[in-house]
């Protein structure tokens, strides 16, 4: 095997290991729920997300101010979350003021996985760099 082939094999291996680590840490870190996210065309898409809880409320974060589904949230928006195998309806509110709270709760709950994913994402998901908008969920 020549030098170029070895470099290609190493690069492909690094990409595969990176992908497996990212997926493994996000799925196996702790509780993962399924957000049934509304799409522009009226359909729904199932998205796996982390969820945190405090004071009888829950928060998820998946999307920024340009995300269609975030823009659609209003005072009476309902979201469907599949949690512990059960579909549960929540009132959903874009909650920019809870950004730091969400990240602190996420670090508490997901610990090592949260730290490692932050490293693998080169700091893009850290509290300081994240542009995501937390969504507060209140049980109906």
What does each of the following model-derived ranges do?
Residues 44, 66-140:
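Short, structured beta-strand-loop surface elements
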Residues 23-24, 60, 70:
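Covalent nucleotidyltransferase core used to form phosphodiester bonds in nucleic acids
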């Amino acid at each position: 095997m020549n030098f170029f082939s070895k470099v290609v094999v190493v690069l492909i291996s690094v990409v595969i290991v990176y992908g497996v680590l990212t997926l493994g840490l996000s799925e196996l870190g702790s509780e993962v729920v399924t957000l049934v996210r509304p799409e522009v065309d009226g359909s729904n898409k199932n998205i796996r997300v982390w969820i945190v809880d405090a004071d009888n409320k829950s928060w998820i974060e998946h999307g920024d101010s340009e995300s269609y589904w975030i823009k659609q949230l209003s005072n009476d928006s309902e979201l469907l979350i599949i949690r512990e195998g059960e579909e549960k309806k929540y009132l959903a509110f874009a909650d920019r003021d809870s950004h730091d709270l969400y990240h602190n709760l996420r670090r508490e709950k997901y610990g090592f996985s949260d730290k490692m994913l932050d490293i693998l994402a080169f700091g893009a998901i850290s509290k300081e760099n994240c542009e995501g908008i937390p969504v507060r969920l209140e049980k109906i």
